[in-house]
């Protein structure tokens, strides 16, 4: 689920972490897991300012993910 913050979108997750490829789908950046995998393997995704090529990278609360000119911040729900 995306929410708007002053500077970037906030994406809420209901678990401690989410894998990078799953996050791209959850945030509606990609239409499928295959598409997510290709963008990640091509070095088109940054996590906390660093290019990330591991699709299974665990993304935790507070991480910032950049893709295609957009930034999102992950927020783990406490509910």
What feature does the model see in each segment?
Residues 4-18:
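A detector for short, charged/polar N-terminal pre-domain segments
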Residues 19-61:
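A basic, amphipathic helix-loop patch mediating RNA/tRNA/ribosome contacts
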Residues 1-2, 17, 23, 35, ...:
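Generic N-terminal leader/processing signal
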Residues 54-79:
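C-terminal structural segments of small proteins and small subunits
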Residues 1-3, 78-79:
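Short acidic DE-rich linear segments
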